[in-house]
């Protein structure tokens, strides 16, 4: 009986080892298909790899990424929505095993951001931001999550700005209020109350991104945009003009850096 038990254990280990080898083979096939743009085939390979070895984190990450790659932001088809939701689910499964997996944290933050725009979902934007903040908590030296917090804060504050102007125009027919005009005093007060803290957060985080990566031209572009939202909080023309001047300066800096990057040969 003892020998039989030992033999059965050996068989079990052998079967487990074979399954893990098969999982890695399926993973490699999936990676090759993914690199060739054959995403449907890649998904099936990654699924098989995951089934054969549920502990193979790379299979889960690649499966989630393959779903996310096929997701088209704003496309309303049920299949497209299913792709986005499947990506979220797979990234969440990775985080259940390792809550500090940066790749999964970034992946879910990215797909939620893409899913939040159309149809608009404030909840998804906020959830996306929470994942980028998790990245910051784990690796505060990385500039990218600060950038994404700034992008989300601008996206939300810009939408709120347009809505505030639209509501005022409807209530005051015949009175012009252009998108770059100062906000009326009552609208400005409400806008600051609802968005002021978020705008300040975005500006702070984008400046942090630039502190960590001084040539981060995309961060400069969004800092310019958020400073324009900050200008809508200004109570005096001089304060508004100063903020708009700062915004314009970042536009010029971003242009200079982009031009410099274009003129610099890529490293081999």
Predicted feature residues:
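Bacterial signal peptide processing site
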Residues: 19-21
